[in-house]
Amino acid sequence: MDDVSFEVSADAYGRFMGRFSGPLAEQFVDLVGVEPGQRVLDVGCGSGALTAVLVSRVGMGRVSAVDPSESLVEVVRTAYPSMDVQRSGAESLPFPDGSFDAVLAQLVVHFMTDPVTGIAEMARTTTPGGVVAASVWDHAGHKGPLSAFWSAARSLDPSAPDESDLPGVAEGHLAELFAVAGLTDVASSSLTVTVEHPSFDDWWDPFTLGVGPAGAYVTSLDDAARDALRDRCRQTLPNAPFRTRATAWTALAHV
């Protein structure tokens, strides 16, 4: 997994993506049907948005989590000191075959170095009859949480890397990756969250923290280009307070 743009503080990560990933996690866990008594794994846990929901459903002792970012692993370890949290990419999970009843990856597959291998590893560590599930933002359909940002960026710089070509972000592609990884009877769906922004700065400032491709793009700009992008985003968005909606594709399969 590519952690170059995610070796950041938990505060920065939370301000940038946590406002969307928190509410998404509740819906995602409901979709998967995680139940008390199950052993579950959070692949690419980040600062712990999905982890927190899993802990609330099955208890700390039945959740494990991995992430390639050491700083984010330490955040989750601190929050859940008795939980098994390890630094690892998805492509080589440090668990025996069939260790978990459910293995989930929220907003991770599109950043895996090798998504097919990562999904296959998720399946390997799932017990027979268990569930493998993933979600990714609809960047290709321009319905993700960063769509307004990338639309503004590309209006000024057509070469801006808007994440629309990442693995799994187009409708149906996440399910295709599951199939290539060897999973069958893959169910696809979508989930949508709505986030309130009390001011433009509340929306904009997290983009300046260097998180993910969008944050890396902003920090790569000189002051004039950054100010121009900020102004273009302000022109694009409604007057504050305003809401943004974000849709994620999901794929789910039983092993």
Where are these regions (language model features)?
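Conserved Class I S-adenosyl-L-methionine
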Residues: 2-6, 20, 47-49, 165-255
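Acidic/polar helix N-cap motif
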Residues: 92, 96-97, 114, 170
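Conserved catalytic/acceptor-binding region of the Class I
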Residues: 116-117, 123, 127-198, 214
